[in-house]
C-alpha cells in the first residue's frame, strides 16, 4: 500500500493546515478548496489494488473532461475506467442524481416565484 503524503495549504484565516487525503482537505479547508478530482475521489471512497481513489478520479475526469461531460453518460461506459466497479459507479450515479434533483428544485422554486 502506498504511503499517503502529507499536504499543506493556508486556510482563510491564514493558518497552516495539513491533510493526507481529499476528505481531510475538505474537512480542514472546506469543499470549495477541493478540485473536481478530489471531490470525485471522496465519492469513490476507496481505491482498488494498486490504484488509489485519487488516481481513479483523475482517470474519470481525463476521460470526460469535467463533471458536465459525465452527466448523461450511460452507467455502462464507466466500467471501462480502470479501478471502477459497480459500487463506485453506483456512488457516482447517486451523487449526480442528488445534484440533478437539487438543480431541478432550485429551478422549480425560481419559476414559482417569477409567475
Model regions and ranges:
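Short, compositionally biased low-complexity segments
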Residues: 32, 100-101
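Short alpha-helical linear motifs
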Residues: 65-66, 79-82, 97, 112-115
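Long, highly charged, low-complexity intrinsically disordered interaction regions
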Residues: 2-81
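Long, charged amphipathic helices and adjacent flexible linkers at domain junctions
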Residues: 103-115
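Structured, non-catalytic alpha/beta "coupling" segments that mediate domain-domain communication
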Residues: 88, 93-99
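Alpha-helix termini
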Residues: 48, 96-98, 110
Amino acid at each position: 500500500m502506498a504511503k499517503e503524503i502529507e499536504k499543506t495549504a493556508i486556510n482563510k484565516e491564514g493558518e497552516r493546515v495539513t491533510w493526507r487525503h481529499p476528505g481531510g482537505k475538505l474537512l480542514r479547508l472546506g469543499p470549495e478548496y477541493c478540485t473536481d478530482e478530489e471531490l470525485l475521489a471522496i465519492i469513490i471512497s476507496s481505491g482498488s489494488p494498486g490504484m488509489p481513489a485519487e488516481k481513479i478520479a483523475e482517470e474519470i475526469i481525463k476521460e470526460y473532461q469535467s463533471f458536465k461531460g459525465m452527466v448523461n453518460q450511460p452507467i455502462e461506459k464507466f466500467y471501462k475506467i480502470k479501478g471502477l466497479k459497480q459500487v463506485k459507479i453506483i456512488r457516482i450515479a447517486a451523487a449526480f442524481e442528488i445534484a440533478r434533483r437539487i438543480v431541478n428544485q432550485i429551478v422549480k422554486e425560481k419559476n414559482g416565484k417569477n409567475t
